[in-house]
């Protein structure tokens, strides 16, 4: 007699202890139980048979703790679930430990269990989750046993598909089998489920074999016939009123399983003279869930992947989706319930699959023309039905036919869309190529589709409008509408690309009808707000079709004039040093360009210009719903070039944005959006007309510029109210746009310095007063958080006010009347930061404001930089260092040489803080992110020092003792193969360093070793003595030679130049993702030759390349490329050379 396994008693005991909620149980004992059960699962190859025995015992018992047919007690449910999990573990993760005998034994035991429990027993008390869990386990056993061990695995289960004859019916055996068939289909075919599995080649081959054998053995036919039989019986019983709920559950489950089998079984099994009429009958059942599931089956049949086009067309004819769907669409049209919408969407999916299939044939040039024509003829009757689905106001229904619409418009675009002209600047456009014209029928179809899509853009009548704000907190209905609106817009734009005139006609008709109805006296009563908002939305998006935001978009220019305008813009761009013309270039090209100035107003308005004029004259800006007026303001800002050409309209536009419809609107969301739009208007509309209105405009907006510092409630005791108040979207954050706008406006009055100073004082005075009172309160009580927040807000407002002033060249700074006031603001900022330097939010605001003051007046603030830096440099948190380094880079770029002393003073303490942080252990993802960002930031900071010709800071008396350590640290980063970003930045630093510290007097005195062909325009400037950075002051090569650092050439030859070759050639280097690193190394090589001349070439040929075992002919070719190719070409050559070195 075999010994009884101790697991048979230990597992039940452990599960009871581990699952117990009895507080008297010793926690140590409970932990022992949990540890034991964990080991049972880990050693599933040894324990699975015991677990299977425990699960199966007591079969036929009425419930847990009662005796079954085998004379044993059925165990508790949670215990049996654990046992099945162990069995699943061995089946899924360790199937190889189960031999043929074990598989056969398990199979027979489970079949016997089902016979006892589900045929003659309590069916697990009807608990569906237990039935489903067993079905999953059987499916995993099936995949282990079929077809090699047990080819008839499914036959006992097929027998269970016979409809029950008992009353009330026992459907649990059928439901178990249906679930088993579903689990099998999902395992071997369902793409969604398969993505969650580790898909090996062996697994894919196994799944393919299982599908093939099921098909070849006829098991698919048996399964489908069994499932159809259950559905048939269920419908019959439900129509008779017998156990409707039980049968409805069975039919629903069977339809779901049938849907999972049909995609991969033989078409003849799923579609034949018996099944097709059965599907038709199901589609007309009164229960919508059955109809929806059947539509899914129908869609699968329509989309079935049949390779032969002729056979596929034949199948589509047999299915006749249009004839099937048409009456169903008519019957359900107007239904508002969610179930009806879901069913209609499922019908739309069928139609869409049908259309996509036909387009796939008609658009395939490899298919015989006759078949392509047949496919197109079959598609034509589907088009009116497509439009009906598109017009449904329940979003999921029109979205269901999106693939059909997309494919249809795609082929129309290819057939009818004019190609983009490949005209070079200054040349006349080439004559348009001849394209076939849209037939009247297709144009009418597109017109109908366009009309439907445009009307679908209107807000639903049952959805309450909300002003744009935090998109993350959008109401679900509004979010769904905006998503749907975006889909419709993409289709509208596609139609416009196919036939721009059609788009213009339809949009103009709808917009003009709406504006006329409103302007004729009907007002809001005649035009619902949804219709008015739609008209404004259409005008707003109209310009997107032309892709032209210049003034030419508003006028009908003759072709020759349009070309002349383009030439004028190009001349203006070249004359101003820009490479991209701006829209203002054709307004004023300067005194020497007056002959090229184009007077647009002499030409008739384009459709967009006409629509904008109608908007302006219709009075729609006074519509009493914020959605309409806000969209009107969006139009004003988007098409500002149009209004700038009509100065007489500007006072009205500003007045509208300033009144109760705009920044004074009672709706906070509208008001906040208008703050931004008003700022944009002020920034983009700087002309004489606006200059004359500055004073009244500022007077009108002054009450909106009162800053209220309100501390928000915190959600947890640890939450910092200051951080919460200053992050994310807030009212004050939007209010700051008004201060930027006021800066733009005050600057416009530059022709009258006295007036400008008065207006500047009117804006900045209250801000400085509020700043001062907040600082004083915080000085008296350092825990007064509201005072701290007040200081933050006023500093940010001052910064945004300064942001409204343009960056002025240093040579003009002395002429600025506002230099003194801004310097006073900077002084006030310093007083604030010296008192509140320990507050993170104040430091953040102070950095922003100070950088804006530096932009506005330049070098006069340079003398204040040391004081500012001294106040804050010791206070930074590790995460704040990154922002501080970016701040210093901004100052260096704006103030350039004026920051040398500050950076000299700052370098060592800054390096100390940086490396202290980087040397701390990384204990989590937050620290890892801080380390990565800080490393990138300090490397970018070092590079900026080099770019701004501040390289001398590294070798001052103060910093020179640490210079070697800095070089060593950076050099080590070039060897760090785990951090490609740092490698690239380190190589970039060294490529600049060889010019700064390694230029030899001999190379500077001799002719360049580079051939003329190697000189791009920038390279020629460099070879003549300039630096490689276009934004830095030019430093001649002779000056560089005088600054040459003795001994640095040794570092170049011994460390840097070898690293440029060896690092990317190393096997640890990721060559695929490291192309930019190799390019930086190539720049290092090239700059070394530039700095050292022939000496560097001789070193590479006679020493370095030989040590790298580079053949002499290859080495000579590399040097020849180096001295004759431009930098961008040599980067590619060097990359190819490195790849060859790696083999």
UniProtKB/Swiss-Prot annotation:
List the GO cellular component terms. Answer: cytoplasm; nuclear matrix; nuclear pore
Q: Which InterPro entries match?
A: ARM-like (IPR011989), ARM-type_fold (IPR016024), Exportin-1/Importin-b-like (IPR013598), Exportin-T_C (IPR045546), XPOT (IPR040017)
Amino acid composition bias (Polar residues), ranges on this chain: 576-593
| KW tRNA processing (keyword) present | yes
Alphabetically ordered keywords of this record: Cytoplasm, Nucleus, RNA-binding, Transport, tRNA processing, tRNA-binding
Localization annotation: Nucleus; Cytoplasm
The GO annotation for biological process reads: tRNA processing; tRNA re-export from nucleus
Q: Which Pfam families match?
A: Exportin-T, Xpo1
Provide the GO MF annotations for this entry.
Answer: small GTPase binding; tRNA binding
Superkingdom in the source lineage: Eukaryota
**Region annotation Disordered: residue ranges?**
566-593
Query: Which family does this protein fall into?
Result: Belongs to the exportin family.
The UniProt function text for this chain reads: tRNA nucleus export receptor which facilitates tRNA translocation across the nuclear pore complex. Involved in pre-tRNA splicing, probably by affecting the interaction of pre-tRNA with splicing endonuclease.
Can you say what this protein is called?
Answer: Exportin-T
Species, as recorded: Cryptococcus neoformans var. neoformans serotype D (strain JEC21 / ATCC MYA-565)
User: What taxonomic lineage is listed for the species of origin?
Assistant: Eukaryota, Fungi, Dikarya, Basidiomycota, Agaricomycotina
């Amino acid at each position: 007699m075999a010994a009884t396994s101790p697991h048979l008693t230990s597992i039940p005991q452990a599960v009871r202890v581990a699952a117990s909620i009895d507080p008297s149980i010793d926690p140590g004992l409970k932990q022992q139980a949990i540890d034991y059960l964990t080991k049972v699962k880990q050693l599933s190859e040894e324990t699975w048979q015991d677990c299977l025995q425990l699960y199966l015992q007591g079969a036929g018992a009425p419930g847990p703790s009662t005796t079954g047919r085998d004379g044993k007690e059925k165990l508790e449910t949670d215990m049996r679930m654990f046992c099945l999990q162990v069995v699943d573990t061995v089946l899924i993760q360790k199937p190889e430990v189960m031999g043929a005998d074990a598989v056969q034994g398990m199979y027979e035991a489970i079949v016997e269990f089902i016979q006892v429990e589900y045929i003659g027993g309590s069916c697990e008390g009807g608990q569906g989750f237990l039935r489903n869990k067993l079905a999953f386990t059987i499916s995993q056993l099936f995949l282990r046993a079929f077809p090699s061990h047990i080819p008839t695995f499914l036959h006992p289960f097929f027998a269970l598909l016979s409809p029950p004859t008992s009353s009330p019916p026992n459907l649990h055996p059928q439901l178990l089998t249906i679930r088993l068939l579903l689990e099998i289909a999902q395992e071997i075919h369902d793409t969604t489920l398969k993505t969650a599995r580790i898909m090996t080649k062996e697994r894919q081959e196994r799944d393919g074999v299982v599908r093939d054998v099921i098909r070849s053995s006829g098991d698919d036919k048996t399964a489908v016939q069994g499932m159809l039989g259950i559905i048939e019986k269920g419908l019959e019983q439900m129509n008779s009123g017998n156990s409707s709920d039980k049968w409805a559950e069975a039919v629903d489950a069977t339809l779901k399983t049938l849907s999972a089998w049909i995609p991969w079984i033989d078409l003849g099994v799923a579609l034949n003279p018996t099944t097709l009429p059965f599907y038709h009958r199901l589609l007309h059942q009164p229960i919508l869930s059955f109809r929806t599931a059947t539509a899914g089956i129908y869609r699968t049949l329509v989309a079935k992947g049949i390779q032969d086009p002729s056979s596929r067309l034949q199948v589509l004819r047999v299915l006749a989706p249009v004839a099937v769907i048409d009456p169903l669409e008519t019957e359900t049209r107007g239904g508002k319930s969610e179930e009806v919408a879901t069913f209609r969407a499922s019908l739309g999916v069928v139609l869409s699959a049908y259309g996509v299939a036909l387009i796939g044939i008609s658009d395939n040039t490899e298919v015989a023309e006759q078949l392509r024509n047949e496919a197109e003829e079959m598609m034509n009757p589907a088009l009116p039905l497509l439009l009906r689905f598109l017009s449904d106001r329940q979003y999921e229904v029109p979205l269901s036919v999106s693939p059909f619409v997309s494919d249809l418009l795609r082929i129309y675009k290819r057939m009818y869309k004019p190609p983009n002209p490949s005209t070079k600047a200054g040349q006349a456009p080439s004559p348009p190529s001849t394209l076939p014209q849209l037939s009247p029928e297709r144009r009418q179809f597109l017109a109908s589709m366009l009309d439907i899509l445009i009307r679908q853009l209107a807000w639903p009548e049952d959805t309450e409008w909300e002003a744009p704000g935090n998109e993350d907190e959008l109401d679900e209905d509004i979010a769904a509408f905006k998503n749907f609106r975006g889909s419709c817009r993409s289709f509208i734009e596609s139609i416009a690309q196919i036939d721009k005139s059609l788009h213009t006609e339809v949009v103009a008709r709808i917009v003009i009808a709406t504006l006329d109805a409103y302007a004729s006296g009907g007002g809001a009563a005649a035009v619902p707000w949804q219709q008015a908002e739609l008209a404004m939305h259409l005008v707003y998006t109209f310009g997107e079709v032309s892709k032209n935001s210049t003034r030419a978009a508003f006028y009908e220019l003759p072709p020759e004039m349009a070309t002349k305008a383009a030439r004028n813009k190009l001349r203006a761009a070249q004359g101003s040093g820009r490479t991209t013309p701006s829209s203002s270039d054709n307004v004023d090209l300067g005194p020497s360009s007056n002959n090229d100035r184009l007077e647009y107003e002499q030409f008739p308005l384009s459709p967009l210009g006409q629509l904008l004029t109608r908007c302006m004259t219709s009075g729609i800006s006074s519509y009493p719903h914020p959605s309409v007026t806000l969209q009107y303001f969006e139009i004003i800002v988007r098409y500002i070039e149009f209004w700038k050409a009509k100065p007489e309209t500007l006072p009205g536009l500003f007045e509208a944005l300033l009144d109760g419809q705009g920044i004074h609107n009672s709706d906070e969301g509208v008001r906040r959006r208008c703050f931004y739009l008003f700022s944009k208007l002020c920034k983009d509309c700087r002309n004489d007309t606006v200059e004359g209105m500055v004073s009244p405009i500022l007077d009108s907006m002054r009450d909106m510029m009162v800053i209220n510092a309100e501390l928000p409630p915190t959600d947890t005791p640890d939450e910092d109210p200051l951080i919460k108040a200053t992050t994310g979207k807030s009212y004050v954050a939007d209010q700051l746009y008004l201060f930027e706008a006021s800066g733009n406006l005050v600057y416009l009055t530059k022709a009258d310095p006295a007036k400008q100073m008065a207006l500047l004082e009117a804006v900045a005075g209250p801000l400085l007063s509020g700043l001062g009172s907040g600082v004083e309160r915080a000085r008296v009580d350092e825990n007064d958080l509201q005072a701290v927040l007040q200081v933050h807000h006023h500093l940010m407002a001052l910064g945004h006010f300064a942001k409204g002033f343009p960056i002025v060249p240093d040579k003009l700074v002395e002429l600025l009347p506002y230099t003194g006031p801004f310097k006073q603001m900077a002084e006030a900022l310093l007083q604030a930061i010296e008192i509140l330097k320990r507050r993170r939010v104040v430091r953040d605001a102070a950095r922003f404001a100070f950088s804006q003051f530096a932009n506005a007046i330049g070098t006069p603030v340079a003398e204040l930089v040391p004081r500012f830096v001294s106040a804050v440099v010791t206070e930074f948190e590790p995460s704040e260092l990154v922002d501080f380094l970016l701040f210093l880079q901004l100052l260096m770029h704006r103030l350039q040489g004026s920051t040398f002393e500050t950076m000299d003073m700052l370098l060592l303490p800054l390096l100390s803080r940086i490396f202290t942080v980087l040397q701390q252990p990384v204990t989590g993802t937050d620290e890892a992110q801080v380390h990565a960002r800080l490393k990138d930031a300090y490397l970018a900071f070092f590079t900026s020092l080099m770019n701004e010709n501040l390289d001398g800071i590294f070798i001052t008396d103060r910093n020179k003792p640490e210079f070697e350590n800095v070089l060593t640290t950076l050099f080590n980063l070039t060897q760090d193969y785990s951090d490609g970003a740092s490698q690239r930045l380190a190589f970039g630093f060294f490529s600049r360093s060889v010019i700064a510290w390694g230029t030899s007097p001999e190379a500077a005195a001799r002719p360049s070793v580079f051939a003329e062909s190697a000189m791009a325009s920038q390279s020629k400037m460099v070879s003549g003595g300039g630096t490689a950075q276009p934004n830095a002051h030019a430093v001649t090569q002779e000056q560089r030679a005088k600054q040459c650092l003795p001994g640095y050439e040794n570092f170049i030859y011994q460390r840097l130049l070898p690293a440029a070759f060896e690092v990317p050639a190393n096997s640890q280097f990721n060559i695929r993702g490291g192309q930019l690193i190799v390019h930086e190394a190539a720049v290092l090589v090239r700059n070394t030759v530039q700095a050292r001349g022939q000496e560097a070439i001789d070193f590479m040929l006679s020493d370095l390349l030989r040590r790298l075992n580079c053949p002499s002919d290859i080495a000579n070719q590399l040097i020849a490329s180096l001295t004759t190719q431009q930098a961008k070409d040599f980067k590619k050559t060097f990359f190819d050379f490195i790849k060859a070195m790696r083999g």
